[in-house]
C-alpha cells in the first residue's frame, strides 16, 4: 500500500512539473497623496500633536487627597436589622419573600428581593413610604423590577456613608485603562464599581439639581478627569461662569487647556454679552470644521485627526490637528433670563450639529424647565445627571421619570443615557485639590496664549445698513420722544406707555438703534440713550 501511494505521489509531481503556471499578483497603484504621506512618515514619523509641549507632565496623583478611607465598612448589625424590618413590613401586608440579597455601596445598600409567585409588583411599589417609616430612613427608592434581573430592588441609605475620593476613582484600572476619546470618571455605583463614561458617546451632558446638592463638585469631577487623562493639545475648555466664582479656579491653566475669543482679557467668561459672542464664535468654528471634514472626506473628528497624523492632509490647504472643545456652562438659567433667544439659538445649533466635529456641551442648571431648556435643546441631551431635587415634578423634568426626589444629597445622583437609571455617589473633589492641580499645570511651560476661537463681530453693528428709514413704524417718532424724555432705552417702557406688544416694541427699539437714538444691547441692562432731552 505504501509503495502504491509513493507511485501515485510521483505521478502527481510529474503532472505538476509538466504544467507550471506562474501567478502574478497585481499591486494596487499608490496614489500621489499616499506616496507623499508615506515618504513623510519614513522621514519624520507620524504627526504628534503633543510635540509643541513635549515636556508637559500630566498631573501627579499625589495632588489628590485620599480621605483615609480604604474601603467600605460592612456593618453586619445594620444589614441584619434592615433585612428584618423589610421582611416584617412586607409580611404585614401579606407579601412573602422567597429570597433576599444585599449589595453594599458607598452611601446606599441595595436589597434585592424575590417575592413569592402571584404577588403584584405595583403592590410592593405602593409600600415605599411604609418601608421608609419602618426603617426610619430618608431617601428610600424602590426599583421594580431591576432591569435585566428577576428581582425588585430596595435602596436604603447607609448610617455611616463612605466618602468617594477623586483619587480612588482616578487610580482605578477602569479609568486608567479606559480606551475612550474623552473618559469621565463620575464616581462609584451601588456595587462599588468605578463609573466611567465617554463624553464623545453622550455627546452632551445636562446636570441639574437643587442648590447645594453637588452640581459644582460634579463639574469639577468632570474637568479633573479630563485634565488627568488628556494632553493640552487634545482638549480645550470654554468655561462660562455667570456666578463668577465657581470656575475662576481654572484661570491658571489658561495657556494650556482653555479657549477664548481674540482680544478678550480673561479666558473664563462671566459677562453675558461675551457669552453670546463666544457661542456664535463656536458656531463659526463648527461650520469651519465641517468644511475641513468635507474637504478631507471624513465623517467625524476622529477619522480626520487620524488622517492628519498619517500626514495625508496638507497644512497648506488649511488642514490642522483639531482638539476637542468642551463648552461648560455653570448656571444656564441665568443666561436664559438675561439673554434669552440670543443664547438659545447658538446653543440649539451646537447641540444638534457639533457632536461629529468634536464640540461637546456640559450644561448645569437648577431645574431644566421648558422656559430654561427648550424641547429642541433637551432632545439633544440624552445623557443627564440629576442630583437631589425637591419634588417628583422636578425629577420628571430632568430625567423624564421620578427618583431624584428620593436621593439623600451630598453628591448622591442618578445618571441616565436614554435607558435605565444608574445611582452613583459622585467623586468628591475639594477646592484645595483643584487649586493644586491648576497650580501644577499652570506652573509648566504652556502655549504663548489660550487657544483662539474664530473672531465674531456682533450683528448690531450692521443694523443701521439693514433697516430702511421708509420702513419705520408709524409710532417711531412718538416712541423716540418717550425714550429720550425718560432717558431709558427699554422695550418694556414702550410697552407700558404706548400699550404695545413685546414684538412691536422690540422692533421699534431696533429701529431707534439704527437711527442712533439708543445704543447697542447690553444684556439685562437698559440700552444707553444717545440723545439728550
Model-derived features with residue positions:
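Low-complexity, intrinsically disordered P/S/T-rich segments
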Residues: 1-206, 395, 533
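Terminal-proximal interaction/regulatory segments of ATP-powered molecular machines
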Residues: 96, 458-533
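Glycine/charge-rich, flexible interdomain linkers and switch-proximal surface loops
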Residues: 101-111, 140-158, 296-312, 319-322, ...
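Conserved short loop/turn motifs at secondary-structure junctions
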Residues: 114-117, 368-369, 496-501
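Interdomain boundary/hinge elements
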Residues: 142, 388, 392, 448-456
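AAA+ P-loop ATPase motor domain of ring mechanoenzymes
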Residues: 419-484
